């Protein structure tokens, strides 16, 4: 599996890049409120076709690796030994980010995967580690079709609300040399063109994503850091509290929209 992934990263991306075509015409966007549209709606027709075909969608390689990691190898600790069949994890991706009482911080699904890897004495390194993203992709695919259920029903609710409020502030705060906030693109300019792309509402329903400009999979954490860079602001370190707060707000903002599973993006 790993050698297939390696070969794909060398040769496969350029083939998809040739097929990507332009962004969809604004006039072709569905009617109705633009702020409720998935990012998949804003893909070009050629990329949407690749997204919908498992035989050409590069995400399939990460899903296959995720399945192998879940089951593990004989004699080694595995996810399945603790959690059983992957289908039992149908709800898993719907609950993150959440407040961890033990760690006293907001964590997302990739953080939880890293924590679990330490418990099995097979620690993974880094949020964008291929194994971490493969397991994240598998869990998000398993939760596809379900809505986010991120509001806690326990004693963490009060702290969770404080974190959510901070995320909302970050979403509307101008930053960087361009003096822009998230809301200026993803609320006020949805459907307009920027850098050859049509601006989407920025709902995190299709993560982790395979982004052509990255030539790899990436998490919400990575995408948010890219946005900081895009407006020429100081980029937070991976896993920073503000990134988790923003992710929490974005998923709260997407309440009522189904998780789509790992997706392709330009």
Question: What are the residue ranges of the model-derived segments?
Answer:
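Acidic helix-start/capping segments at beta-turn-to-alpha-helix junctions
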Residues: 79-89, 96, 154-158
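Short Cys/His-rich "knuckle" micro-motifs
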Residues: 88-92, 192-196
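Post-cleavage N-terminal segment of exported redox proteins
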Residues: 3-8, 13-62, 98-165, 212-235, ...
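The canonical Cys-X-X-Cys-His
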Residues: 74-86, 135, 167, 177-189, ...
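Short cysteine/histidine-rich metal-coordination sites, predominantly Zn2+-binding motifs
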Residues: 94-103, 198-206
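Surface-exposed interaction/gating patches
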Residues: 67, 140-193
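N-terminal carbohydrate-binding/catalytic regions of secreted carbohydrate-active enzymes
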Residues: 63, 69-71
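Intrinsically disordered, low-complexity segments enriched in Gly and acidic/Ser/Thr residues
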Residues: 187, 193-211
